[in-house]
Amino acid sequence: MFSGFVGPDDGEPTSDASETVQISSLALLKMLKHGRAGIPLEVMGLMLGEFVDEYTVKVVDVFAMPQSGTNVTVESVDPIFQMEMMSILKATGRHETVVGWYHSHPGFGCWLSTVDISTQQSFEKLCKRAVAVVVDPIQSVKGKVVIDAFRLIDNQLGVLGGEPRQVTSNIGYLKTPTLISIIHGLNKHYYSFNITCRKNDFEQKMLLNLHRKTWADNLKLGDVRSKREEALKLIESYGKAFEEEKNLAGKNPDMAKVGRIDYRRRLLEKCEESIMENTIYSLLYSIHRYIFTQ
């Protein structure tokens, strides 16, 4: 039946895996914040950017979609909301096009389910270079973001016995796939490619000032209740330690304290800290009262 088929070696190029997705810091923060807000359910959104060249996809911004998901799947895209959101973004100066979509996998890694594959197929019908980004907000900790980008493999290549994709890249390293992603069809139904997060000067200044304290932070009143509870626990622990010292008749008390917490010293430090904080809070309360009564 397929006797006349020559295969991908007849001069036709196969899909290249050396593309790189450049995600801006703003887009990455939005994806992580949106994903953490939806835990334990999946959330999804669209990515805005441009196709710079044949090997680069640039993502500059994202916006969330009002879809609700289960712990393993997420609903399809709402086209009405997408059109309204795109018109609003154009009015605010965002003229980028949709380059793909993202969704979260809270706690179970980066891969594509059958529903995700069908959603990606609908995107690739509109644009062959559409990208599906998966982010895990639970496994993503400070300094390491668990994220991956995928694109589908043409099923006809596998049926006809052709090579699904080729790797021709000078990136310099290969990303080792996880076992769960291989089980769910990585390099069989879809493939992964490199992700980079570049920061310009403005984004770098923004990230450096993200948690920077200002003069207004010094006017905030702290939580006094937690300080009191901590002091009460220290008093109870010091009382128990004092009773234990009474029972050490005929023994060296200094040797019994070796390797144990000195609750008396901690209690004195906590008292000095509380006195200083009470003085500051009294001053702040007077300042607030003077400001709001004028």
From Swiss-Prot:
Please tell me the species this chain comes from.
Answer: Encephalitozoon cuniculi (strain GB-M1)
Q: Binding residues for Zn(2+), per the UniProt record?
A: 103, 105, 116
Q: Where in the cell is it found?
A: Cytoplasm; Nucleus
Give the protein name, as stated in the record.
26S proteasome regulatory subunit RPN11
Which Gene Ontology molecular function entries are recorded, alphabetically?
metal ion binding; metallopeptidase activity
Q: Which purpose does this protein serve, as stated in its record? A: Acts as a regulatory subunit of the 26S proteasome which degrades poly-ubiquitinated proteins in the cytoplasm and in the nucleus. It is essential for the regulated turnover of proteins and for the removal of misfolded proteins. The proteasome is a multicatalytic proteinase complex that is characterized by its ability to cleave peptides with Arg, Phe, Tyr, Leu, and Glu adjacent to the leaving group at neutral or slightly basic pH.
Highest taxon above the source species? Eukaryota
Q: May I have one GO cellular component term?
A: cytoplasm
Predominant location: cytoplasm
Q: Does the keyword Protease apply?
A: yes
* Complex and partners: The 26S proteasome consists of a 20S proteasome core and two 19S regulatory subunits. The 20S proteasome core is composed of 28 subunits that are arranged in four stacked rings, resulting in a barrel-shaped structure. The two end rings are each formed by seven alpha subunits, and the two central rings are each formed by seven beta subunits. The catalytic chamber with the active sites is on the inside of the barrel.
- Keywords, alphabetical: Cytoplasm, Hydrolase, Metal-binding, Metalloprotease, Nucleus, Protease, Proteasome, Zinc
Q: Which InterPro entries match?
A: JAMM/MPN+_dom (IPR000555), JAMM_MPN+_peptidase_M67A (IPR050242), MPN (IPR037518)
Q: Return the similarity comment.
A: Belongs to the peptidase M67A family.
The residue ranges crossing the membrane are none
Any GO BP: proteolysis
- Where do the MPN domain residues begin and end? 21-156
- Which SUPFAM superfamilies does its entry note? JAB1/MPN domain
Q: Which PANTHER family does the UniProt entry name for this protein? A: EUKARYOTIC TRANSLATION INITIATION FACTOR 3 -RELATED (PTHR10410)
Q: Which CDD domains match?
A: MPN_RPN11_CSN5 (cd08069)
